[in-house]
């Protein structure tokens, strides 16, 4: 088995964008979200990580647009951003997305999140957005508690998968936080998807080396948009690792 590659399409104000360290105002615009996702699909990606940044920041919604993107793609989609209650969860699942990511709600409404983990199993992943050993919530604008305490609670609730993002790395192309990923994997038996900082094929090889300890996939965004490597090159590197 090789790591799963999830090219990222982050959407703000109807456009595909990339942020630096999650900071509002740091957007680089890349155009139509469907065109971006379709390009990754044509290059061989089997998953797309699709994010509604406006919903994540609590400043609006691109729900209809994202639902249309999911419908028009032929690959599996992990949908993220603003999923905080039953209504938003049901709407996200109703798009046909293979999996949804819950971030802020895991911190702000633990009882709801624990119930959802038990009820939906593999269709829900928990996004752990980390700065140091502190979690960030609400589009990374608020602190959300101690990473290890929250991870232990989510494990007890039966969380099936974690998407771990080092916020200080995200959108910077400075390399992933391998130490953080190793430590998370050591503390949970659930699979982990790595996100943040991936900039080279060597970074992908380093992440592939963590597959035996629990890393299952990798989200790549800015490196693909910036042309650091292609989806085809990334898939080949992961297959050969």
Swiss-Prot record:
Annotated active site: 10, 129
Pathway named in the protein's UniProt entry: Amino-acid biosynthesis; L-histidine biosynthesis; L-histidine from 5-phospho-alpha-D-ribose 1-diphosphate: step 4/9
Keyword Phosphoprotein applies: no
EC annotation from Swiss-Prot or TrEMBL: 5.3.1.16
GO cellular component: cytoplasm
InterPro entries in UniProt: Aldolase_TIM, His_biosynth, HisA/PriA_Actinobacteria, Isoase_HisA-like, Isoase_HisA-like_bact, RibuloseP-bd_barrel
Matches recorded under CDD domains: HisA (cd04732)
Known catalytic reactions: 1-(5-phospho-beta-D-ribosyl)-5-[(5-phospho-beta-D-ribosylamino)methylideneamino]imidazole-4-carboxamide = 5-[(5-phospho-1-deoxy-D-ribulos-1-ylimino)methylamino]-1-(5-phospho-beta-D-ribosyl)imidazole-4-carboxamide
SUPFAM superfamilies for this protein: Ribulose-phoshate binding barrel
A GO molecular function held by the record: 1-(5-phosphoribosyl)-5-[(5-phosphoribosylamino)methylideneamino]imidazole-4-carboxamide isomerase activity
GO biological process, one term: L-tryptophan biosynthetic process
Broad class of enzyme this protein falls into: isomerase
Protein's cellular compartments: Cytoplasm
Record-stated family: Belongs to the HisA/HisF family.
Protein's recorded name: 1-(5-phosphoribosyl)-5-[(5-phosphoribosylamino)methylideneamino] imidazole-4-carboxamide isomerase
Organism listed in the record: Salinispora tropica (strain ATCC BAA-916 / DSM 44818 / JCM 13857 / NBRC 105044 / CNB-440)
